[in-house]
């Protein structure tokens, strides 16, 4: 019987699944398999959704539930390295039952199958790294842009999680905002309590809270000025893709913030590659190329031998589930060789 590893990416509204053949390394799901998360209804409700969604996904792709020998799970942070949700959880985990909830342990108990855990940024970073380098020795740093800014550091195919599981929380690294002329000296606030970190400029939250209001003052007749802030922030990307001047300027500001962060990392780690992913980059190849050029322009000039390699994390929203599956496969292989 074939041995299958499941990858589960828990988001705020949806759970993404993938299935990986442990013997061949082939993914059985080419794109996304989704199931409603219902995370705002509490931990136990969401846990049931995860289990039910996995059963439905396995059935859809002709996989016997008993063939699933390991599961990889990722969630938004902050959480411990073992999958215990922090009291300062993400906006997806606002129900009173979430703080301190052992999601990994609870899922393992429900399934009766070993479950490994990764932060969602680390999971996507692992998939991006392995897609680019495979088993070759290399170091990569990833930025995953969504509601916030996640990411990960991967060294020779291993995620650097850190002592408490907070390794790769790149969004909360401070950057020199004064080097971004469009900000006019402003150091925007972040939900974490810091001012002027990367996430405070480069995230959907940053667009809604800081950048869109700032640029609408400069473009008072822009159509987005008459749209509710939350909805308007989500429409900035489509306007920018069509070449809208104001929205391109917003994305350029975000790119320059990320470029400044990458510059700091280059001087600290000199990685083999930077990878960028998340919903913000699910755009046309032309817009991706423009935005990567803007990120590079935001980096102060480097020595020629330090010229950074910038890449897009493949497979879009499926990246997290795929990275979680790879982590579970590695855990299974390590246990077998111990």
Whereabouts are the PLM-identified features?
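Short glycine-rich, Thr/Ser-proximal phosphate-binding strand/loop in the N-terminal lobe
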Residues: 2-48, 86-90, 165, 175
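Glycine-rich phosphate-binding/hydrolytic loop that grips phosphoryl groups
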Residues: 7, 116-130, 282-338
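Glycine-rich phosphate-binding loops at beta-strand->alpha-helix junctions
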Residues: 14-15, 265, 269-295
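N-terminal phosphate-binding loop and adjacent alpha-helix
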Residues: 27-67, 96-98, 242-245
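Glycine-rich phosphate-binding loop and adjoining helix at the ATP-binding site
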Residues: 44-48, 67-70, 77-139, 184, ...
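Phosphate/pyrophosphate-binding loops at sites that engage ATP/ADP/AMP, CoA/4′-phosphopantetheine
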Residues: 50-71, 114-115, 262-274
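Glycine-rich phosphate-binding loop of actin/hexokinase-like ATP-binding domains
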Residues: 133-201
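A mobile "lid/hinge" subdomain adjacent to the ATP/sugar-phosphate binding pocket shared
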Residues: 188, 194-273, 308
